[in-house]
Amino acid sequence: MARRGIGGVGPVIRRALTRAALRVAVKVARPAPPPALPVFAMGMAFINPLGLAAGFDDDGTLLAALALSGFGSIEIGTVRTPTMLRAALAHIGRHPRHARIGINLAATATGDAGETAERWRTLMGLTWDAADYLVANLSGSRGAPGRAESLTAQAAMIGAIHGSLARTRGSHTPLAVKCALEYVPAGTLGSLGGCGVDAVIGVSADRDLIARAVRDLAPLPLISVGGIRDGEDVATRLAAGAALVQIHTAFCRRGPFFPRRLLANLATGTMPRGGG
């Protein structure tokens, strides 16, 4: 059973309510463009540093509405199979590019390294021309013995496939690796820079871990996600050196236009704790 949240509403119900409210809000409202807060990361310009994390829009059906919410980037997924991916690609193709679109991928590991690698190659190949950036979701890695080596090995394997696709296609679609910072020993993140990735999406609400990740990754950008409740949390992550910040639960709790309020406060430097 889903854990209960604010007002006794569990996260699954809360997400469904937010999705319904989003569809209605964008039809009746005519929101002004959010303030311009351009940033540059992964070799691309973003209209602002605020993104929607994967897990809210699994298949891209809400892209147009989410772009009106003010996000500078929207991450679709997590997508695990070609069938799921093809459904999402149909929606992405109809989306007028406003926010950057990322596709969060997770190929199911098998006992056969070659088969696992081929699954990653298939997923990345299908998304190569559709997404602004790709995400290899390795956030399920835990802190068991050898996990640090496993994370690096997985990133190296995925990075090698990504590099091969770039050479074959004659183009570059940036690749980010998503991992849970609390399970990554000190010094491990620095090794990801040699794996051919363009950024790391670090899941953590711990300020010390976030600051350490920024130091270890430099010059690779950190995209921070996890535990963000309000605008002050976003400002704190950016001040700590994160290039981009993603939200999820706060969006479900605060409603469709929370991102616009947050960005307006970020632009003026007014960040009330507990508010937008």
Segments (PLM) and residue ranges:
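Glycine/Thr-rich beta-alpha phosphate-binding loop at enzyme active sites
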Residues: 22-35, 138-156, 179-220, 253-262
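An N-cap/entry alpha-helix motif that binds or orients negatively charged groups
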Residues: 1-41
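Glycine-rich phosphate-binding active-site loops on the catalytic face of alpha/beta enzymes
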Residues: 70, 74-82, 137-140, 198-206, ...
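Active-site entrance/lid segments in N-terminal catalytic domains of soluble metabolic enzymes
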Residues: 42, 51-63, 67-187
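Short, glycine/acidic-rich beta->alpha junctions
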Residues: 54-58, 229, 276
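Catalytic cores of alpha/beta
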Residues: 59-68, 118-122, 182-195, 212-222, ...
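Short histidine
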Residues: 254-276
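Expand to "…catalyze enediolate/carbanion chemistry for C-C bond making/breaking, isomerization
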Residues: 103, 200, 269-270
